[in-house]
């Protein structure tokens, strides 16, 4: 089996989703090919994900937070004005009819 195919199948092999024959062929290839074995070792190592708060802080600097507060504040004000105008129009129409 070529390195290309083994590298393509490594995620399935690690998850245990390969057939027995395929697992055997991959294991034999890993014994002979140090490059694929290194890739296997790298993929098999567990890794830590950053905490959600750390990621949030990295992507939301203070200026962006201020911008969002202003933007959504204005959006709410506009929506309230449009709602008020619609209610006023409905009252005027009701009084005229």
Curated annotation (Swiss-Prot):
Disulfide bonds: none
Function: Anti-sigma factor for YlaC.
Misc. remarks from the entry: The interaction between YlaC and YlaD may be regulated by the redox state of YlaD.
Keywords of the record: Cell membrane, Membrane, Metal-binding, Transmembrane, Transmembrane helix, Zinc
Protein name: Anti-sigma-YlaC factor YlaD
GO molecular function terms attached to this record: metal ion binding
Transmembrane segment boundaries: 71-93
Domain of life the protein comes from: Bacteria
GO CC field: plasma membrane
Family the UniProt entry places it in: Belongs to the zinc-associated anti-sigma factor (ZAS) superfamily.
Needed co-factor(s): Zn(2+)
